[in-house]
């Protein structure tokens, strides 16, 4: 009874905060300056990571770029230098914890303390559970979520000491709603979203108000990781569009960045609608892609 009474007493606050949130959405947010910041981006040799590096290069930042692909990271670095940025590329396998820690030491010695960390590196395997090999499952979690722990543990202390910084988690819409034949990927992205949310609350509990967090959750992106993805939610997203939303979210300290915005509505529907209706809804959304190993379409 006391719990119910407490909830009723909180209703006026809920109404006030809802109105406040609505008004804030109508007012354009001022973008913060990131000039002079040291920005580290993992998975910067291609796709979202590469384009994010280009955008930060235009903003007078110092870039630290990581990728497992030497040619890819050098190409990104060359373009960023043409855009006027100081760039430090490193070949790093984000599935290897000790390799990450070794690179961290080099970054601190050669460049300095990272103040904006973009955990972007990711892998995906399209297969049913039984066709997904054990090493593939392990690598999915090592890159898609465990690497976030190792990099954040390494660079967050300096941000907390200065009460200034930003940790960016590149997750996925698959971190909120599941897709068949992406079991390992969805599980790892749910973990990445959980990492972001728990880190956000932990920083708040510690009083680190100057250390910001953001989490990107896009729908399918045309980067070649998944072959011919399609959904009735709309066309496959182009990387440039996603990065535009990501940069706006970072520069305005947005905590959760959904692309498209309708993904946010889906996450709410999954929690309140009956399961049978959700089954019908998922059939209407009709997520499809090629090259599913182990599954035979009947």
Swiss-Prot record:
Active-site residues (renumbered): 185
Q: Residues of the signal sequence?
A: 1-21
In terms of domain of life, where is this protein from? Eukaryota
Show the GO MF annotations.
estradiol 17-beta-dehydrogenase [NAD(P)+] activity; oxidoreductase activity, acting on the CH-OH group of donors, NAD or NADP as acceptor; steroid dehydrogenase activity
> InterPro entries this protein is in?
NAD(P)-bd_dom_sf, SDR_fam
Q: Name one GO cellular component term.
A: cytoplasm
Q: What does this protein do?
A: Can convert androstan-3-alpha,17-beta-diol (3-alpha-diol) to androsterone in vitro, suggesting that it may participate in androgen metabolism during steroidogenesis. May act by metabolizing compounds that stimulate steroid synthesis and/or by generating metabolites that inhibit it. Has no activity toward DHEA (dehydroepiandrosterone), or A-dione (4-androste-3,17-dione), and only a slight activity toward testosterone to A-dione.
UniProt protein name: Estradiol 17-beta-dehydrogenase 11
């Amino acid at each position: 009874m006391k719990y119910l009474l407490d909830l009723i007493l909180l209703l006026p606050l809920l109404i006030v905060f809802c109105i406040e949130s609505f008004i804030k959405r109508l007012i354009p947010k001022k973008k913060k300056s990131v000039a002079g910041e040291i920005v580290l981006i993992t998975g910067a040799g291609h796709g979202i990571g590469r384009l994010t590096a280009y955008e930060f290069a235009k903003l007078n930042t110092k870039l630290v770029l990581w990728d497992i692909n030497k040619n890819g990271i050098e190409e990104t670095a060359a373009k960023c230098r043409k855009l006027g940025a100081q760039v430090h590329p490193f070949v790093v396998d984000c599935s290897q914890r000790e390799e990450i820690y070794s690179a961290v030491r080099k970054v601190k010695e050669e460049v300095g303390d990272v103040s904006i960390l973009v955990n972007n590196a990711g892998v995906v395997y399209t297969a049913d559970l039984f066709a997904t090999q054990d090493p593939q499952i392990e690598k999915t979690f090592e890159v898609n979520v465990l690497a976030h722990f190792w990099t954040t543990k390494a660079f967050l202390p300096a941000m907390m000491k200065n009460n200034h910084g930003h940790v960016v988690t590149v997750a996925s819409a698959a971190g909120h709603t599941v897709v068949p034949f992406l079991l390992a990927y969805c599980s790892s992205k749910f973990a990445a979203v959980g990492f972001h949310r728990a880190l956000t609350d932990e920083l708040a509990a510690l009083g680190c108000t100057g250390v910001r967090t953001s989490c990107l959750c896009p729908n399918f992106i045309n980067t070649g990781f998944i072959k011919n993805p399609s959904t009735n939610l709309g066309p496959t997203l182009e990387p440039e569009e996603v990065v535009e939303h990501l940069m706006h979210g970072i520069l305005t300290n947005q905590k959760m960045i959904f692309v498209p915005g309708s993904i946010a509505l889906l996450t709410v529907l999954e929690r309140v609608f009956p399961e049978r209706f959700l089954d019908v809804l998922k059939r209407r959304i009709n997520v499809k892609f090629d090259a599913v190993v182990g599954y035979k379409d009947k």
